[in-house]
Amino acid sequence: MAIRGPEASSFFPLTLVFSVGFFCARFFLDRLVYKPLAAYCFSSKASKLMNDEVRQAKIVKFSESIWKLTYYGSVQAWVLLIIKQEPWSLDTMQYFEGWPNQYMTSSLMLFYMCQCGFYIYSIFALVAWETRRKDFAVMMSHHVVTSILIGYAYLTGFFRIGTIILALHDASDVFLETAKLCKYTEKELGASLFFGLFALSWLLLRLIYFPFWIIKTSSYQSIISLRKLEKFPTTLYYIFNTMLLTLLVFHIYWWKLICLMIMKQLNNKGQVGEDVRSDSEDEE
């Protein structure tokens, strides 16, 4: 089923369905799968020497990471399948051509509802569920901006370029959560390998491809297509590009912290430190 851009807004309430669905899925998977799996992974003699508080903290963090890996791995596979099927996906000049009357497939519509629902869920999970970290305020700001950006791209019909943006971002998160799981289970080689892939993907996708291809397309190449309209969508254009630049600021902030982690790893004979994301978790 193909959905014309202006008609897509009628499906937007599905985001709330997905948000509630993620709460339920996380609740049951935590209790039935993730925590039992974590307890099994920390059942070795060495793990049993930890005090109960430390062991429980590791189980909680392990459960968080495997939940995120499940999600990011699934949606990354989904978006890559969408990109493979869409003729416009690799041609940046097509991202805004024919706007606002572009058509989206039902799969792409559901993908957007899923992603927006997940980040809305993540805002509440960050407050009430997940381990509190030192970069809480930055992470909360990121989730809010991302939720708004996904919803905005969908409702305004900028969903083609938005799809590519989501594909770029989820790839890094897959490597990140895998590195965390390796670190929590003391698989140092795996942690170092996936942290390296995480850092490399962050640099290439979020700090090179995102600004020099995606933001360039959104702020410059888009004008070629949008000027064909009777009235240039000035407000929509500036709001969208402002949000993309805000996202880039988050990327630069976290890249600084990733570089600190790289230096820490080099000084630690190649072993990844406790927090492979941003050096923001409390030491355990």
From Swiss-Prot:
The UniProt entry's GO biological process terms, in alphabetical order, are: ceramide biosynthetic process; long-chain fatty acid biosynthetic process; response to molecule of fungal origin
Determine if Transferase is one of this entry's keywords: no
Q: A GO molecular function for this record? A: sphingosine N-acyltransferase activity
Gene Ontology terms, cellular component aspect? endoplasmic reticulum; endoplasmic reticulum membrane; Golgi apparatus
Q: SMART domains, alphabetically? A: TLC
The answer to whether keyword Nucleotide-binding applies is no
Q: Where's it found, cell-wise?
A: Endoplasmic reticulum membrane
Parts of the chain that traverse the membrane? 9-29, 69-89, 108-128, 148-168, 195-215, 243-263
What the entry lists under InterPro entries is as follows: Lag1/Lac1-like, TLC-dom
Mode of membrane association: Multi-pass membrane protein
Query: Which keywords has UniProt assigned to this entry?
Result: Endoplasmic reticulum, Lipid biosynthesis, Lipid metabolism, Membrane, Transmembrane, Transmembrane helix
- The residues covered by the TLC domain are 60-267
Briefly, what is this protein's role? Mediates resistance to sphinganine-analog mycotoxins (SAMs) by restoring the sphingolipid biosynthesis. Could salvage the transport of GPI-anchored proteins from the endoplasmic reticulum to the Golgi apparatus in ceramides-depleted cells after SAM exposure.
PANTHER family, per database record: LD18904P (PTHR12560:SF0), LONGEVITY ASSURANCE FACTOR 1 LAG1 (PTHR12560)
Q: Can you name this protein? A: ASC1-like protein 3
